[in-house]
């Protein structure tokens, strides 16, 4: 549902700040106190404090950092090029009338991810003297958008990097995006591979086989036993010999949310008995030499290297046993699973990983080589489908805060003649200390319950209930300030931080731009992209602008943990004589969102695709490669079968009737129709306003 694609070549002034950063290793993180309250009161907040708080060094290396101005920077070429100030970049894009929310895609990061993966395999092959090569493929399902796939194919060309298709539509993309060889040799290895996964019908297999005539090298991976007979039949009819693979259901159990990708009840693949059945079918058809690849997948985002080691040991043994049964085994596709360190802890926490790319590669190579050497079987070409590790870092979601809601009411005055429950609450507030704060919390909880009961039975008026609630929250806030200074917080007070958190209303839809955050509680790094030289004194959660209580983010990264609030800055009000107060823009970034999020987003509340800007570095700074405008309201209405012209005509008719009945003036009708027609052509998200702050 992308909007119209507009390509721009706009060079702007460079900001050549160099960031010397390298890919993080796999050493375990050390717990440090990231609580802003722990910062000594007699010293100023620094960007080092922000780096520690938001853990940007952990999850952001080597691409993201903070500069001296307190702004997040991105180094798309890692340690080989300059850095861009994200805050200044967003300001420049807004001056070009590119509204928020927007997605920034950095194609140079894609290039760097491919370079790093291939370099790691090259080092591993050299270290172990592995007697074959590596041929990576990008699984299109991670992000199918055209500019992404085009960039990946372009940057992968020096490495003969191929594509993986998991469906018929993705096969159509792969066939048209990969450049076929003009005069391919039957056993040519130095060309991109096209791995054909997923469930297949006759047309899928026919198309894949005919692609060999074009000069492609498709490998049809059998996911179900029934596909073997179909492939044999179609191959015979077309007179084209296929390259076949089988996907194995490993007994090695994955981990995390995708652990069910393996095992006897996994959705995809063949069990060992089914593999033997497939081999016999191919043997009877005199096509056993067509079986050349073993594929497995133990799930996305594998956090522990031990799981990878176990899977590689099992898969390597299956590979050599297939070869001993007479299959012409030449390829081993280890699938996906190469993780992304979303929280920067470098541990086996589900939002992290306790290994780096080189660790992963070394374990893949050594396991395969050990098994093949022991069995005297030729070592295969190694294939991986590391989509998440390739695509995640290149996309950054930027959105603004349109309003906040704080629980910080003024302390009401309580007089001697007021109800006893109010006097009790005020007395509690006055006497809260570090020695009795837990007891005081229990007291105010009881008083609040009593106040509600008194109100429900008519013994307390509405104004008195309001006073009771204000006093209750004042007591809770005073208790929370004490809790923040303690090394240990009692269990019954742990929810205070959440209960008193501000709500920051974000101009975005979680369902459209971060669906995994809503659907599976995926953690993404989120932080302000500016004001990082200031202490973030607020604690908040994020609520999107959909009319859905699930449209919120209330889980944030911590060190091998999840925290329920995010440290944020108060909105800044600007007062000018003769004009309403204006709130300065406050921009937040959600990072590492380049895999799966865009394509899985939905139209909840009819919030459509957002603006996408492709940025590429050049000697002068950067240029906008592509601008893909987000959906307009008219476009989104069209997706759900409304004709905007019909809607506008209905509105004209209603206005005419209202004027005829003297319920509306001509000026009012014109204003309504102008607003309606103009709105149809506008972005589905909110325009910048003066901002709203409520307490």
UniProtKB/Swiss-Prot annotation:
One of its GO terms (biological process) is spermidine biosynthetic process. Gene3D superfamilies: 1.10.287.3440, 1.20.58.930, Alanine racemase (3.20.20.10), Lyase, Ornithine Decarboxylase, Chain A, domain 1 (2.40.37.10). Substrate binds at residues 332-342. It is an enzyme of class 4 (lyase). InterPro entries: Ala_racemase/Decarboxylase_C, Arg_decarb_HB, Arg_decarbox_C, Arg_decrbxlase, De-COase2_CS, De-COase2_N, De-COase2_pyr-phos_BS, Orn/DAP/Arg_de-COase. The modification N6-(pyridoxal phosphate)lysine is found at residue 141. It holds the Pfam family Arg_decarb_HB. GO terms for molecular function: arginine decarboxylase activity; metal ion binding. Disulfide bonds: none annotated. The keyword rRNA processing does not apply. It catalyses: L-arginine + H(+) = agmatine + CO2. Keywords: Decarboxylase, Lyase, Magnesium, Metal-binding, Polyamine biosynthesis, Pyridoxal phosphate, Spermidine biosynthesis. Its EC number is 4.1.1.19. Catalyzes the biosynthesis of agmatine from arginine. HAMAP family: SpeA. Belongs to the Orn/Lys/Arg decarboxylase class-II family. SpeA subfamily. This is Biosynthetic arginine decarboxylase 1. It comes from Synechocystis sp. (strain ATCC 27184 / PCC 6803 / Kazusa).
């Amino acid at each position: 549902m992308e909007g119209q694609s507009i390509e721009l070549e706009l060079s702007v002034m460079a900001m050549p700040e160099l960031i010397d950063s390298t890919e993080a290793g796999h050493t375990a993180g050390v717990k440090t106190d990231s609580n802003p309250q722990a910062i000594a009161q007699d010293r100023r907040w620094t960007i080092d404090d922000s780096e520690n708080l938001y853990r940007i060094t952990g999850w952001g290396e080597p691409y993201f950092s903070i500069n001296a101005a307190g702004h997040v920077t991105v180094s798309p070429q890692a340690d080989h090029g300059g850095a861009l100030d994200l805050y200044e970049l967003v300001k420049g894009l807004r001056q070009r009338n590119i509204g928020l929310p927007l997605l920034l895609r950095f194609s140079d990061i894609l290039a760097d991810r491919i370079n790093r993966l291939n370099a790691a395999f090259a080092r591993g092959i050299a270290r172990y003297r592995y007697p074959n090569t590596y041929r990576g493929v990008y699984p299109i399902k991670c992000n199918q958008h055209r500019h992404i796939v085009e960039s990946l194919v372009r940057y992968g060309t020096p490495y003969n990097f191929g594509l993986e298709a998991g469906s018929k539509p993705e096969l159509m993309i792969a066939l048209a995006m990969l450049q076929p060889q003009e005069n391919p040799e039957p056993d040519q290895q130095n060309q991109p591979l096209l791995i054909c996964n997923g469930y297949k019908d006759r047309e899928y297999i026919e198309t894949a086989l005919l692609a060999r005539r074009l000069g492609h090298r498709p490998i049809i991976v059998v996911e179900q036993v029934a596909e073997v007979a179909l492939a044999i039949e179609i191959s015979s009819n077309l007179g084209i010999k296929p390259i076949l693979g089988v996907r194995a259901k490993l007994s090695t159990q994955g981990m995390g949310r995708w652990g069910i990708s393996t095992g006897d009840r996994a959705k995809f693949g063949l069990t060992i008995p089914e593999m033997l059945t497939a081999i016999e079918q191919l043997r009877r058809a005199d096509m056993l030499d067509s079986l050349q690849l073993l594929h497995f997948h133990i799930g996305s985002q594998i956090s522990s290297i031990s799981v990878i080691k176990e899977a590689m040991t099992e898969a390597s043994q299956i590979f050599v046993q297939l070869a001993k049964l007479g299959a012409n085994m030449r390829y081993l596709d280890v699938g996906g699973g190469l993780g992304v360190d979303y929280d920067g802890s470098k541990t086996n926490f589900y939002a992290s990983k306790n290994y780096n790319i080189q660790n992963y590669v070394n374990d893949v190579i050594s396991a395969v080589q050990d098994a093949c050497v022991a069995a005297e079987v030729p070592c295969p070409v190694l294939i991986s489908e590391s989509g998440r590790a390739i695509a995640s870092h290149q996309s950054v979601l930027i959105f603004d805060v349109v309003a906040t809601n704080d629980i910080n009411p003024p302390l009401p005055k309580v007089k001697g003649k007021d109800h006893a429950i109010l006097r009790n609450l005020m007395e509690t507030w006055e006497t809260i200390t570090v020695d009795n704060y837990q007891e005081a919390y229990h007291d105010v909880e009881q008083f609040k319950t009593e106040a509600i009961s008194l109100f429900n039975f008519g013994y307390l008026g509405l104004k008195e209930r309001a006073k009771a609630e204000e006093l209750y929250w004042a007591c809770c806030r005073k208790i929370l300030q004490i809790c923040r200074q303690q090394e240990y917080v009692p269990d019954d007070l742990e929810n205070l931080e959440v209960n008193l958190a501000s709500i920051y209303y974000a101009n975005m839809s979680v369902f459209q731009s971060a669906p995994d955050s809503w659907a599976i509680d995926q953690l993404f790094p989120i932080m302000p992209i500016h004001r990082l030289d200031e202490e973030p004194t607020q604690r908040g959660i994020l609520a999107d602008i959909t009319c859905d209580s699930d449209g919120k983010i209330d889980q944030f990264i911590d060190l091998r943990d999840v925290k329920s609030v995010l440290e944020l800055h108060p909105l800044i009000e600007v007062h000018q004589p003769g004009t309403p107060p204006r709130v300065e823009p406050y921009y937040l970034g959600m990072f590492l969102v380049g895999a799966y999020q865009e394509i899985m987003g939905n139209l909840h509340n009819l919030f459509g695709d957002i603006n996408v800007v492709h940025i590429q570095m050049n000697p002068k700074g950067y240029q906008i490669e592509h601008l893909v405008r987000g959906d307009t309201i008219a476009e989104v209405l069209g997706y759900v079968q409304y004709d905007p012209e019909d809607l506008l005509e209905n509105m004209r008719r209603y206005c005419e009737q209202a004027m005829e009945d003297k319920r509306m003036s001509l000026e009012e009708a014109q204003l309504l129709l102008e607003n309606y027609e103009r709105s149809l052509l506008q972005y589905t998200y909110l325009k910048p306003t003066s901002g709203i702050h409520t307490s």
